[in-house]
């Protein structure tokens, strides 16, 4: 079973301001085309995946929900997730269940029931329960066109 680092996620007050800062400090910019050139809207906010020299940084700008609570508690730019990509999320799910770990459907701690992953842009993912107030581990399976 393949397991690779995929990205880190940061909660931010403003994707635009954070992008401006990253551009000024490090010359980081969104690609001109493709999946990684887009800012995506979702029910509780928006996000962008920013490729930086082979590493991806996900900027999450919440407007509601558990990530907004995390932002208020931890502050702008706080690391909220460390994501690992797997080639078979079903096997990874089974492995964690056998270990007595219940995968979560969302950052808020909602248990994932009967493998009903919430697909986002073809990706399947779940979280592992957080210990304390730190970042969550996210487990992700991507469709071939996004790898």
List PLM regions with ranges:
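N-terminal beta-strand motif that seeds the catalytic metal site of vicinal oxygen chelate
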Residues: 1-20, 79-84, 140-147
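Short loop/beta submotifs within extracellular cysteine-rich repeat domains
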Residues: 29-30, 67-68, 133-137, 146-147
């Amino acid at each position: 079973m393949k397991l690779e680092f995929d990205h880190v996620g940061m909660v931010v007050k403003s994707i635009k301001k954070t992008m401006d800062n990253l551009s000024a400090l490090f010359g980081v910019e969104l690609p001109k085309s493709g999946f990684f050139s887009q800012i995506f809207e979702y029910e509780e906010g928006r996000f962008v995946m920013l490729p930086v020299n082979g590493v991806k940084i996900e900027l999450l700008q919440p407007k509601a929900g558990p990530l907004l609570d995390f932002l208020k508690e931890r502050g702008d730019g706080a690391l909220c997730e460390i994501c690992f990509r797997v080639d078979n999320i079903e096997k990874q799910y089974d492995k964690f269940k056998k270990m007595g770990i219940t995968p979560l459907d969302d950052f808020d701690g909602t248990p994932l029931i009967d493998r009903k992953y919430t697909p986002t842009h073809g990706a399947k993912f779940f979280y592992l329960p957080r210990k304390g107030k730190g970042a969550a581990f996210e487990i992700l399976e991507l469709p071939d066109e996004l790898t």
